[in-house]
């Protein structure tokens, strides 16, 4: 790996904005053959201090000269400026050597101003062999102006368990935070974070936390004013304004769904479901299910359920008089009107003066069989 140059002329500026991991120190007796590297890449350096060059912090396990005297540096070290929210460091274990790290402490000492520092890697792990970024974040809460003190304590060991690098014990760093101002302010207990965005408490949302969240949502134009509480418009009530307060009654099983409006069952219409869609009433127990359309009970058919059904019909010599009852024409009888009177006596001698016997129509019960239904008959 190519060596990166250290820049002693930048030391004072680095102390003012890079106080955390730059204060790593090497343990006494560190072996010279270690292959651990830590640096700030050119892009991050340009963002932080305006110079686009890599800034070396640790090379072959050894600290850059400008990071050695921590106590003197801490005495003159100002707080991290308001506009610096995080810093990126790049590290790498070159060759085959294995290094293990542990963040022993990430703690804010002024939690009303800044939350605990954050890192984008596990708190315990191995230094990667491929150059990788470690980001340390300084999360100001935006609730008030002030300077927050915090700790970042990390240790790096080799595969034999020897400490290679560590932050000094009881090292305290500082971050300047500012009370954020969100345009329009934050309502309902929300607070403006350092990005000037309102963070809303549970149950509220919106750019200013001005909207309450009701589950289920308010219906029929209801307004959610606090979490779970709807103000209903006139004519509605219920937890989520789902019920209508009808001033009129819905007849015939209709249901009021809006003030003055009813949902009518099939076959009925009108503002109060008082009108049938069938101009003439359905007969024999039939029910109106649409405009001029009846649903007939078993045994009847027709537009108005006025025609009885005989199963299996009355043949050519009878008519269906009642459900399953045939009325036979003169001279015929039987369940289906298919038997003729006197058919067996046609060739027998008749008494003198005797005439043909006239029979009155008779009612006979038919067997079970269905006739084709009419086109508008619904079984």
From Swiss-Prot:
Region named Disordered: 348-379
The UniProt record lists the keyword Glycoprotein: yes
General function of this protein: Binds to WNT proteins and inhibits their activities. May be involved in mesoderm segmentation.
Ranges for domain WIF: 38-177
Protein name from the UniProt record: Wnt inhibitory factor 1
Domain of life from the UniProt record: Eukaryota
Stretch forming the signal peptide: 1-28
Predominant subcellular localization, coarse grouping: secreted
Gene Ontology biological process terms, A to Z: negative regulation of Wnt signaling pathway; positive regulation of fat cell differentiation; Wnt signaling pathway
Keywords noted in UniProt: Developmental protein, Disulfide bond, EGF-like domain, Glycoprotein, Repeat, Secreted, Signal, Wnt signaling pathway
Species for this entry: Mus musculus (Mouse)
Tissues showing expression: Expression highest in heart and lung. Lower in brain and eye.
């Amino acid at each position: 790996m190519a060596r990166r140059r250290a820049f002693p002329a930048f030391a004072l500026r680095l102390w003012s904005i890079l106080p955390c991991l730059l204060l790593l120190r090497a343990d006494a007796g560190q072996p010279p053959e270690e292959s651990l590297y830590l640096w700030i890449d050119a892009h991050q350096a340009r963002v932080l201090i305006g110079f686009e060059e890599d800034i070396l912090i640790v090379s072959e396990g050894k600290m850059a000269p400008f990071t050695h005297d921590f106590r003197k540096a801490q005495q003159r070290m100002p707080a991290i400026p308001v506009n610096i929210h995080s810093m990126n460091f790049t590290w790498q274990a070159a060759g085959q050597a294995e290094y293990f790290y542990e963040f022993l402490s990430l703690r804010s000492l002024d939690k009303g101003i800044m939350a605990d520092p954050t890192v984008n890697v596990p708190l315990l792990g191995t230094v990667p062999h491929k150059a990788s970024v470690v980001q340390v974040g300084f999360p100001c809460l935006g609730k008030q102006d002030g300077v927050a003190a915090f700790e970042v304590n990390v240790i790096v060991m080799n595969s034999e368990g020897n400490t290679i690098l560590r932050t000094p014990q009881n090292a305290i760093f500082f971050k300047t935070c500012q009370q954020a101002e969100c345009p329009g302010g934050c309502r309902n207990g929300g607070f403006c974070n350092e990005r000037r965005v309102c963070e809303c408490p549970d149950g509220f949302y919106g750019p200013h936390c001005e909207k309450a969240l009701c589950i289920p949502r308010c219906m029929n134009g209801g307004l959610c004013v606090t979490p779970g509480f709807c103000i209903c418009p006139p004519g509605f009530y219920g937890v989520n304004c789902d019920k209508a307060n009808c001033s009129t009654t819905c007849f015939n099983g209709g249901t009021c769904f809006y003030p003055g409006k009813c949902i009518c069952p099939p076959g009925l219409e009108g503002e109060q479901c008082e009108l049938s869609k069938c101009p003439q009433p359905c007969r024999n127990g039939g029910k109106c299910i649409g405009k001029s359309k009846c649903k007939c009970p078993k045994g009847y058919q027709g537009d108005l359920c006025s025609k009885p059904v005989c199963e299996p019909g009355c043949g050519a010599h009878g008519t269906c008089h009642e459900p399953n009852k045939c009325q036979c024409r003169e001279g015929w009888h039987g369940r289906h009107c298919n038997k003729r009177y006197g058919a067996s006596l046609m060739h027998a001698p008749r008494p003198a003066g005797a005439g043909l016997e006239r029979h009155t129509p008779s009612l006979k019960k038919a067997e079970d069989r269905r006739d084709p239904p009419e086109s508008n008959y619904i079984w």
